[in-house]
């Protein structure tokens, strides 16, 4: 590799590449979440019959993974570059490999392996066939074909490609610690994120108010249900995300027993399933506006025949 791309150049390169493949460039969703998959741009849009092609950077918070900034590769918050394409292109793997070439990684010169790793997210009732992508022995991407999202079978199938940007940048820039990654010319990753990483770790493991978090979870859960009773999918899903992040903080604090943990996950999953069903019903009422006219007419006619 002649030129070592900065972190922001990696993002710009991926944005331009996936834009050229027909993806809309979305912005990060303004709510805490543990993965880019939980953004409504993936979770909601992966269900139902409408096509959807989008790419976006998603900061992802995982309180239990915080290490006070002392671990070179494990973080409270990391960045994912998320690509979702529905229906999945038949050549999605080739498109992905071509994206690596744009980053200066020639697949013919490196050991790139697709290692089977089927994916599941119990808290949202989602699962799919998946592979980890390993580059010279290091995982850099998760590849998933969604089979179920929010408890609903996906049709058509959505392909998700999730790049781990810190790992990818560490490889491209040949550094051992994420904090040594060059974010922009002359500015290191650690100069931006090391202090927040330490502070969030300290808060998550030592300072957070368990009683307040438990109370918040109950309030967020009730508010999600209340919004759903009014048919308000998007506000409800915001509160599902808040429930998820609050649970993750409780889990990091050690405030949840093994038995309670399963119960909390089930409560989040039940809400997510209702959100998913309500979203599809909402889109159906609108006549699935992103479908082309011919497909929409066929689909709505089939639904009409089923109800007779």
Swiss-Prot record:
- Where is this chain's protein located in or outside the cell? Cytoplasm
Identify the EC number(s).
6.1.1.14
**Keyword Flavoprotein appears in the UniProt entry:** no
Principal subcellular localization: cytoplasm
Give the domain of life.
Answer: Bacteria
Give UniProt keywords alphabetically. Aminoacyl-tRNA synthetase, ATP-binding, Cytoplasm, Ligase, Nucleotide-binding, Protein biosynthesis
Quaternary structure note: Tetramer of two alpha and two beta subunits.
Q: Which family does the UniProt entry place this protein in? A: Belongs to the class-II aminoacyl-tRNA synthetase family.
Protein name as it appears in the record: Glycine--tRNA ligase alpha subunit
Species annotation: Streptococcus pyogenes serotype M3 (strain ATCC BAA-595 / MGAS315)
Q: What is the lineage of its organism?
A: Bacteria, Bacillati, Bacillota, Bacilli, Lactobacillales
